[in-house]
Amino acid sequence: MPCWSTITATRHLGGELAIGDLRCERFRLQAEGLVEVYYTPFDHVNEATRVTLVGITPGWHQMRLAYTVARDLLRGGLPHDAILPRVSSAAGFSGPMRANLLRMLDDLGLPRCLGIGSSAELFDRWADLRHGTSAIRYAAFVSERNYTGSSPPLVTVTLFRRYVFDVLAPELDRVPRSVVIPLGRAVDAALGLLIDAGALDSRRCCLGFPHPSGANGHRMSQVAEIQETLSDKLSHWFSARTA
């Protein structure tokens, strides 16, 4: 459930939100050793989606943008039930990574499967076909730094595994007609936990899709390696649901 008391606490924060404004006790959900998780308003689930993109966890940039959008909408008098969809649309997979992601999805032929012009339209006129989420839904930090999924490995952290089973799995159950595209190896491993437990159908999952971060300089060659396999999987998934 959305922590509205947490979201509304930002109403009175002025200017550009700083780390100290959000990474504080009021917003912290859990802390175990060097691992901390902070509430981030990404609770909206688009149940009409046909494509679900799963990242690792919101980083600081996304966390700040999400709260900034929520704060501004609250100040503008928007009803609570209209705020979360707007936050997800504005802040989900934002920044330079989005351009890389769109090119990679285009290379897999996703627009053709959906009957749209380009993957960019999933963030514009065809946004209702897309849902974005994370293996760890809320912003996770390790040693006060953005958690990148590898140190420590996501599947080895008990707290993170709880998010995968208790938050992500039910979320994916709510979008049964959607293909699931994990962004990178850490999310691959998280989905693997659910597949092995019988909590997720592997036929839905485009395992092996590289992380679109600019730091992954090999992403396009990695896409080329799995292009045929994942393109076929996408075609089979969507054709079976339109027959």
Where do the language-model regions lie?
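Low-complexity, Gly/Ser/Thr/Pro-rich intrinsically disordered linker/tail segments
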Residues: 237-243
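A polyanion-binding, active-site-adjacent surface
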Residues: 1-179, 187-192, 215-218, 225-237
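Extended hydrophobic/aromatic segments used for targeting, binding, or gating
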Residues: 193-222
